[in-house]
Amino acid sequence: MTLTLHQLFPTVVATTKLAIDPIDLAGHLQTLLALRGEAVGNPCEGCAWTGDINGVWQLHRQPEFAPLAQQVAEQAMRYLEAVGFDCSRVALHLQRCWPVLSDWDQLVGRHHHPNAHLSAVLYLTGNGSGEEGVLRVHSPLQSNELVSGLAAGHGGPIARDHPFNAETWDLAPEGGLLVLFPSRLDHSVLTNGDPESLRGSISFDFALSAPEQGNPPEYLAPHPSQWSLCADLTS
């Protein structure tokens, strides 16, 4: 008798490789290092430097990075199509675009992006070994552990790292690798363990709205062009 396992309600993380000229890549890294300036990280010790909290959150508006942003936006639309969206009935907006630079022994703690709907990260460095710190995606729900907390281990009966009870999924950075995932998904970046390597990436936050024309669906925000600033309202 066969026991058939049905893996339901998958969370989709998409990956692809962008073709980036090595000379352009080196230039992008130099620009990002210049934007970081004398800073070595974020205020918390051991944290990577992230542009979003240091005033560098609109890289897509800089001519140097606009072509990269366009490529990423195209892949974001492909992601929407792949998970079932009719792209003629939504508008996709790029909210933020910022660099993340991680020197040796620096990391990014577990977090998600509640202000956005779809997020992406484009790696400018990495050789696939993971030594510079992997991207770790955290499972939002451990349905298959049956008993809450059991999959955490500590001598429990569930096989360690079993694919049906995995708490995390790791992805090693490579230059040109693009990753897209739901913004609500918790993720982190493990410590850069290579004292000779800089881990460099660019993050993107996208938001969905209804198209500018037509009536918006019930659960999709109207297009921002149809919003009104409350301070500008008159009686």
Q: Language-model features: where?
A:
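Catalytic core of Fe(II)/2-oxoglutarate
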Residues: 159-235
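Non-heme Fe(II)/2-oxoglutarate
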Residues: 2-86, 107
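Short intrinsically disordered coil segments
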Residues: 31-33, 135-140, 152, 217-227
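Catalytic core of non-heme Fe(II) oxygenases with the double-stranded beta-helix
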Residues: 100-178, 212
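Short acidic (Asp/Glu) patches
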Residues: 79-83, 94, 99-109
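A structural signal for short, well-ordered beta-strand segments
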Residues: 97-99, 120-122, 202-206
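Histidine-centered active-site/metal-ligand motif
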Residues: 93, 111-113, 187
